[in-house]
């Protein structure tokens, strides 16, 4: 979603702020909204409708294969597996599910001890139902642990099913992939994130402005967990959701400043563009944050298509140089110079 240019200075709020932080009683514990509003049923999950519908078929028919769900963070991979387990096992969920985070428990000992012991346990379940072992962030497991897991999956295939969630399925060894149904999740769209945010805002009675919601969606980049965390953090800190407060909490280069910098490049005004870059640099933002936001703003910036293609090519080239650790401020200043050069009228010979 494009961040609208409101014509006001980024440091100014778009609306009058009410009284700050909502009052909370001493010792009151606020459950994170990510957990409070975590879906409990498959039909409550936002986005990835085709993949979720396959899981609903598994839940109805009962005989689930081993599954791998791969996709970006915050798209509902672990939640989908938990909803599937809840639909399949019902009241037996507590006894028949083992949940492990493979980024902590990543060694071969975990497969030999925890997983093997759970797979050997006897649990009475209805026909066509199996115990479920959930391995979150399975792409963090060592190769040795994955090799050991392959044999365990074969031995206990009559009683136990494995559900793996990971960001990159190519980090799971081929023998495990061939034993599983691989489901792929994609980033959520801005509209899907907005729908869920509005649902939470209504229930929590959160005051907001449209530019505040756009700022949350801009910073989340299709990650629902990030969006809800940013919403709750802004509400807890300021009691009001507007773009100024959101960017204070998220502490990213403000897109209106970045937009202004790109506009100066389009106008071939390198001096003004560099002033904004130097300002962002002195605020302490990392080069990756600055270059990433330049790219995200450039994608929706109103300019000629051929010029946008040239800009994105130069931004990508500079990002590569910055990632290699080459003097970052110099590289970004060079980027501004090249962007200005793209828009300058050719000099008559």
Curated annotation (Swiss-Prot):
The keyword Nucleotide-binding applies. GO terms for molecular function: ATP binding; ATP hydrolysis activity; DNA binding; DNA clamp loader activity; enzyme binding; single-stranded DNA helicase activity. It comes from the Eukaryota. Gene3D superfamilies: 1.10.8.60, 1.20.272.10, P-loop containing nucleotide triphosphate hydrolases. The modification N6-acetyllysine is found at residues 158, 299. The modification N-acetylmethionine is found at residue 1. SMART domains: AAA. InterPro entries: AAA+_ATPase, ATPase_AAA_core, DNA_pol3_clamp-load_cplx_C, DNA_Rep/Repair_Clamp_Loader, P-loop_NTPase, Rep_factorC_C, RFC_lid. One of its GO terms (cellular component) is Ctf18 RFC-like complex. The keyword Zinc does not apply. It is found in: Nucleus. Residues 1-27 are annotated as: Disordered. Keywords: Acetylation, ATP-binding, DNA replication, Nucleotide-binding, Nucleus. ATP binds at residues 71-78. GO terms for biological process: DNA-templated DNA replication; positive regulation of DNA-directed DNA polymerase activity. Subunit of the RFC complex, an heteropentameric complex consisting of a large subunit RFC1 and four small subunits RFC2, RFC3, RFC4 and RFC5; the RFC complex interacts with PCNA. Forms an heterotetrameric complex with RFC3, RFC4 and RFC5; this complex has ATPase activity but is not stimulated by PCNA. The heterotetramer of subunits RFC2, RFC3, RFC4 and RFC5 interacts with RAD17. RFC2 also interacts with PRKAR1A; the complex may be involved in cell survival. Interacts with DDX11. NCBIfam families: PRK00440.1 (NF001679). Subunit of the replication factor C (RFC) complex which acts during elongation of primed DNA templates by DNA polymerases delta and epsilon, and is necessary for ATP-dependent loading of proliferating cell nuclear antigen (PCNA) onto primed DNA. This subunit binds ATP. Belongs to the activator 1 small subunits family. This is Replication factor C subunit 2. It comes from Mus musculus (Mouse).
């Amino acid at each position: 979603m494009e961040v609208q240019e409101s014509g006001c200075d980024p440091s100014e709020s778009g609306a009058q702020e009410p009284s700050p932080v909502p009052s909370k009683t001493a010792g009151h514990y606020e459950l994170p909204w990510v957990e409070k509003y975590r879906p409990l049923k498959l039909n409550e999950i936002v986005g990835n409708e085709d993949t979720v519908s396959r899981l609903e078929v598994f839940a109805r028919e009962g005989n689930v294969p081993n599954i791998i769900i791969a996709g970006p963070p915050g798209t509902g991979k672990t939640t989908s597996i938990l909803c599937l387990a809840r639909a399949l096992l019902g009241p037996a969920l507590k006894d028949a599910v083992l949940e492990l985070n493979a980024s902590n428990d990543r060694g071969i000992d975990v497969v030999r001890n925890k997983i093997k012991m759970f797979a050997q346990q006897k649990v009475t379940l209805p026909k066509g139902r199996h115990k479920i072992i959930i391995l979150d962030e399975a792409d963090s497991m060592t190769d040795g642990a994955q090799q050991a897991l392959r044999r365990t999956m074969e031995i206990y295939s009559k009683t136990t099913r494995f559900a793996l969630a990971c960001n990159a399925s190519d980090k799971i060894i081929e023998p495990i992939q061939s034993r599983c149904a691989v489901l792929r999740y994609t980033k959520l769209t801005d509209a899907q994130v907005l729908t869920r945010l509005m649902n939470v805002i209504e229930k929590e009675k959160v005051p907001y402005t449209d530019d505040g919601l756009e700022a949350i969606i801009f910073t989340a980049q299709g990650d629902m967990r990030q969006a809800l965390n940013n919403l709750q953090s802004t509400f807890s800190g300021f009691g009001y959701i507007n773009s100024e407060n959101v960017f204070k909490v998220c502490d990213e280069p403000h897109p209106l400043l970045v937009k202004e910098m790109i506009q100066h490049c389009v106008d071939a005004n390198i001096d003004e563009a560099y002033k904004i870059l130097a300002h962002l640099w002195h605020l302490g933002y990392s080069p990756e944050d600055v270059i990433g936001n330049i790219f995200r703003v450039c994608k929706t910036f109103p300019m000629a298509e051929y010029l946008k293609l040239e800009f994105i090519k130069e931004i990508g080239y500079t990002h590569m140089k910055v990632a290699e650790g080459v003097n970052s401020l110099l590289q970004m200043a060079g980027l501004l110079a090249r962007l200005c050069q793209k828009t300058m009228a050719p000099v008559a010979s």
